[in-house]
Amino acid sequence: MSKEILIPTAWEDVTLNEFIELSKLDIDSFDSHIDYYISMLGIFGNDDLNNILEFVKLTDVADIINQMAFMNTPPKNLDHKEVTIKGEVFKLIENMNELTVGEYISIETLIEQGKLDSISSIPAILSVILKPIGEKFDSNLVNARMELFKNELSIEDVLGMSVFFSIGVR
């Protein structure tokens, strides 16, 4: 009986949500490196970890680790100002200095209510500053947008937009 294990092979295969979950893993908190990598497989959608352990050979673990070697190198240095999700184009606000008070308060509130750390706060920030072209800010949409971005944006897209944050204004 053949089993399939979901393994990303490039940063573009890793969603924002998966990246957030990966950032919570501390290799030192695991009994072995194998346990650590098995936990990583769970994050990538391999729900039946006990079944996986039954058929994966030690040599397979080495192959799995090699396939995920891309994680040892940073994602490509992209410069994204917009992304397309499910056929809809979302664009970053053009100038961070032009955030409205309502937008700023929404970001702060989402971060405080969720007790989010710097990585976990990325979807909250994006839910306010990454909008469909021409759309005005609507605080009623932020929770749905956070989930959309966590599940549909690759971490490569997100990090590509981080260039925008590092210079503040375009």
Kindly give the residue locations of the regions a language model identified.
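Charged interaction scaffolds used for protein-protein
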Residues: M1-R170
